[in-house]
Amino acid sequence: MRKLNNGYLAAIIILVVIIADQILKIWVKTSFFLYESLDITSWFKLNFVENPGMAFGIELGSKMFLTIFRIVASAVLIYIIYKIRNNKLYSRGFIVCLALITAGAIGNVIDCMFYGLIFNESTPYTMATLFPEGGGYASFLHGKVVDMFYFPLASWYWPDWMPFCVFFQPVFNLADAAISVGMIVLILFYSKYLSIHENNTEKSEVSK
């Protein structure tokens, strides 16, 4: 049995993650009220929130800037994967990490680009509808990212004069998880590949 080409493997990973991410987001968006929470276990909840910012609900800069940044980053990652897919200097694991990061970036880009057009507004009292008659809640590139995974892994009480705190509060989605896993594994096990191009460039300059 022939080994799957790295390029095809990356494409499959990207497609599977994007499809799973979008199916989950559409289900949550059309089945939950905004801020509604569903307890799966004592340490894992589905908690529907929307954010206009970056991964894990972080807000930085304008909405248009963030969306354009995501689009450019996704395009650059796709180009990098295409260029190195058959390069033996880069391991399969490294390309898988890039594919996960790319899939996560594209998954959130889709929300920003189209969700404002194809959904009406989610509120604590009304569920959103896909392709509503009155149109969407925002213009192109101004959609909100749907988040739902919440892991309150540990909790404790501070003194009475301090607020109650919960460890790991950010709510995130499958796309965020793909980006995080790809980045963590990349840094822990494949960081040496990030300097391959730089080292090759230096060697070529010395040989001139």
Language model: regions and residue ranges:
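Alpha-helical transmembrane bundles and membrane-interface segments of multipass inner-membrane proteins
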Residues: 1-208
